[in-house]
Amino acid sequence: VAPMATASTTDKTGAPTTVTAEPGRFTIAVDGKTVGLIDYIDQGGRRIFPHTEVQPEYGGRGLATILVAEALDATRAAGLRIVPECSMVSGYIAKHPEYAPLVDRA
């Protein structure tokens, strides 16, 4: 399945990162290597985020934050509500209240 969309930026080390939207998940790659993902389930106008994961050797570089930000921006652009089951997503929303109006609790 071809990727739906991509966004490019850099992590805290300056390494190039790419977030790719795919059916059921967004992935993040560093220098072209996929190192993390955030799963989602679209259901009745809501996008449920149950899990975020970044490979441990890539921890501390801000990759999960980049991944969550891109996923939430794409969700907002799609007109869907956010259900933050994953603690990473909940924590990000707590620090970025601009997403709070879009949140539905599970």
Predicted ranges, named:
Residues V1-P3:
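Short, Lys/Arg-enriched N-terminal segments with co-localized hydrophobic residues
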